[in-house]
Amino acid sequence: GRPVIVSDPVPPQSVIDHATEIGADLWLFGRDFNFTGDKQQWGWAGRGRRYSGLAYPALRGANQLVNASGVLAALEALRSEMPVTAQAIRNGLAMVELPGRFQIVPGQPALVFDVAHNAHAVAALTENLDAMGFYPTTHVVFGAMADKDVAPMLARVAPLVDRWYFCDLPTERAAKATQLQAVWQAGNARKDVQASTHANPQAALDAAVAAADPTDRIVVFGSFFTVG
């Protein structure tokens, strides 16, 4: 009977089946809670409670309302044991921080960190990058685990990338930079894009910084190890 919150709009059926099997109190996005919003504010509705006129979360990214909706569902599910006031929720949305999730470091060139490490997260990252506006050149530092299906990840963001810096990561579970570059080369159709390999994320980032102009953009993603 313990609550399980699923904010994925299209959750795996196995998750739903397992929650049902163990008798969990399953909260599904779109069934038990949802949100609406415009450019100025948003609202949330759960099983027995509603919030209106909420400010957008302080985090950047197109998927933040989905994430925030899941948090509000968790608070609603636990309200009898851990009551939280509406004002506390409003304050939390305004002050929330999550390093490494579409984290933009101001400066020249612009620097973006994102721990996106699957196709769904990279799709959100790509949408967010596209919304940032024009940059003459986008440099990408990329490292990933060996068990990840990196081909669709690279293909999704590739139209925005002008220079790749593939890197090894400090764990045996990681794919080698040369392996990542080979996957990229197999799917690359743009002859104007350059790529290089590096021994670690810092070396790759140093190379990107050295090559970038002040008006360019550098993006670091693929793993917590890459961003960390």
PLM-predicted stretches and their roles:
Residues 2-6, 52-55, 61, 192-196:
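General secondary-structure propensity
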Residues 3, 25, 137-139, 217:
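Proline-centered loop/turn at the N-terminus of a beta-strand
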Residues 227-228:
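Short, basic/aromatic-enriched C-terminal tail that caps enzymatic domains
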Residues 9-23, 27, 36-41, 110-112, ...:
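C-terminal helical cap/extension that packs against the catalytic core
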Residues 6, 140-142, 166, 220:
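Structural beta-sheet core signal
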Residues 223:
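Active-site-proximal loop/hinge segments that shape catalytic or ion-binding/gating pockets
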Residues 1-51, 68, 72-90:
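Acidic, Mg2+-coordinating active-site environments of NTP-dependent enzymes
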Residues 45-163:
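Nucleotide phosphate-binding/pyrophosphate-handling subdomain across enzymes
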